[in-house]
């Protein structure tokens, strides 16, 4: 039986293949009560970032002060920006059927799921990998595993963190480091092996 394109991607060494890293900022952490205000994705092909998607999103109401301080995003910046309903089709087209990577990716996917169910009537079903879980397994000696702390450990520039495009770019760079470490030490780099490692079964 012929394999589907998606199953082939999932068996590829991701250092040679294609994946998309996503990140978002929202008005809060409760998915049902919060809305996305900053959405980004970067496509990685053969270990190189080849394309980027980024947009601010108008949430429909004023954002909390703590979110302004965290992200640097203000209400004035969001006025006149597209709504999530307007940007969702372009975002989903950019992501395609690729493997999705994120730092604490489960939270991002919960938000995307909320919107795909609301506006598309279906769940977001792309396979996913979490750099937070993988970094804990691959680099066990780090003191902290926030995106900023991991990035600084590798000498990456972290000015502008907590903006979606910056965070997605840093996550991509960290994931490439994880893939390189796993490939050179253990000869693994496919989705299924990484998923087992996430779950502590490697």
UniProtKB/Swiss-Prot annotation:
Co-factor remark: Binds 2 divalent metal cations. Magnesium or manganese.
Residues that bind substrate: 23, 25, 167
Uppermost EC category: transferase
InterPro entries: DnaQ, Exonuclease_RNaseT/DNA_pol3, RNaseH-like_sf, RNaseH_sf
Keywords: DNA replication, DNA-directed DNA polymerase, Exonuclease, Hydrolase, Magnesium, Manganese, Metal-binding, Nuclease, Nucleotidyltransferase, Transferase
EC number of this enzyme: 2.7.7.7
Binding positions (a divalent metal cation 1): 23, 25, 167
Record note on quaternary structure: DNA polymerase III contains a core (composed of alpha, epsilon and theta chains) that associates with a tau subunit. This core dimerizes to form the POLIII' complex. PolIII' associates with the gamma complex (composed of gamma, delta, delta', psi and chi chains) and with the beta chain to form the complete DNA polymerase III complex.
Protein name: DNA polymerase III subunit epsilon
Species of origin: Aquifex aeolicus (strain VF5)
